[in-house]
Amino acid sequence: IHNAKQCVEFIQKQNERIAANDATVESEIAERRFAVLYLYERPYKKAEDEEELWLSEMAQAAADVLGISADHIVKKERKPQKGANQYEKKYTKNIIKGNVQEQNQIFRIDLSTYLDTGLFFDHRPLRAKIRENAGKKRVLNLFCYTGSFSVYAAEGGASYVESVDLSNTYLSWAKDNLRLNGFSDAEKYVFTKADVIEWLEKKSAHIQEDKKFDLIILDPPTFSNSKSTENILDINRDWPVLVENCVKMLNPNGTLYFSTNSTKLSFDESKLPKNTECTDETQNSIPKDFEGTKCHRLWKIRLY
């Protein structure tokens, strides 16, 4: 499957086979089903092999419940980020890549190479909202990662979509995702390699009126210490400046969606620029399968 149209056709045929009680469908689906299991480091002393043993047992339990083989469970470990240290550990040596379909869009994912897979499922509602509201609008996707918001904006009929990220790897991935969904116009769908903090500061100071945006997505990492830039991002500290510069880039009645997965960020509306109104959209943006978690917070900031 190489594009969204083929994906839709495949799913339609699969559903027809299910409706016809084709006995081979379930086994085929199981062959394509994978799960990622994360172990978050526990804050107490333990035997050296305790975590690996526990993770293996949980992986087998997950495989039994999902009806898949144990080698389809990708095991990973997360440790808290401390200062400039960012730690990850992966237990699989297999290369597991492919495409997934979400709300009629198709995305390339990689379950094995990186700690994250390329698509954050907790933001499905916001992606759908972007698609609903992007029609004929200029859209800016900051810290774009693999470009999922950009795909939804393009599908929603945006007149222009710019995706900004410092990583060549993720920008290339984002381009692939746009192409998978049929969006390849280089003038309409622009990819910018830049340090977002620096780019925003310079761009917002001199932006022409006809280059401003109607919709901006600001979904930064909590912390970033890239070798490609001297800037160190700490969203708990830097969010007011980022939001202020985003607002400078908005057209009147334009909207900024600011999201963070930091539980320590202290959001204060008094630090927002003048002539803005803000609503906390967190509860409306968390899907049912993430209820009860602190997966992210989301604010809608409108310039009037």
Predicted regions and their residues:
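Helix-to-beta-strand junctions that scaffold the AdoMet/dcAdoMet cofactor pocket
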Residues: 250-251
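Conserved SAM-binding loop of SAM-dependent methyltransferases across substrates and taxa
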Residues: 146-158
